[in-house]
């Protein structure tokens, strides 16, 4: 029996994939506008992509902005993510700053979930997972390959590693060059979900070619999908409203 992940009334790992919409404002005014606009969307979860935020180097400013976002989102689940440039993010910070930023966010109690990148020092990842869980914050451990789609075995291996490190939600996003690459991601998702996962997983194939993977999570085993509000944070994201409509059609017929 797989465990479910429950965040503020949203349950990941049962029913249709839950829709997450990123907030990508560069400053507090833009973020507040996006958070207010989010309330008009038919989405389940918000993700603050703090790597877009111009004051991300100032932890106090980050925590203050987080408090503003939390207030506007009310009871919506909120993921805090600093995506490194190496994995498709807007900027790079040192490893030490990356971990201290995430730890500071965890200790505010304002984010429900943090996203930690898999390819970091294992002991530091484990320590941050432990700190997060101690503050009742769930953890995504993620990997993003914007260059290619690895072999199915490698995709499964990375997801299993994230699970072993304590992720509540192991995640991988890969870039397809061919249609066969998309099939490989779906095959790996199915294999992980049926053979190895004891918790919900999140997978996607990016760009236009991979769009089917954002829609078919309930069939193949991905518990969350990402939709766009006004500006996409990754290639291939479609509008949240359209996404929910398609997911409901699929859910009714499965």
UniProtKB/Swiss-Prot annotation:
The text of the family note is: Belongs to the type-I 3-dehydroquinase family.
Q: What class of enzyme is it?
A: lyase
Pfam families (UniProt xref): DHquinase_I
Q: Identify the pathway.
A: Metabolic intermediate biosynthesis; chorismate biosynthesis; chorismate from D-erythrose 4-phosphate and phosphoenolpyruvate: step 3/7
Q: What is this protein called?
A: 3-dehydroquinate dehydratase
UniProt-annotated catalytic positions: 144, 171
Which HAMAP family does this entry report, sorted A to Z?
AroD
- Encoded by which gene? aroD
Under InterPro entries, the record lists: 3-dehydroquinate_DH_AS, Aldolase_TIM, DHquinase_I, Type-I_3-dehydroquinase
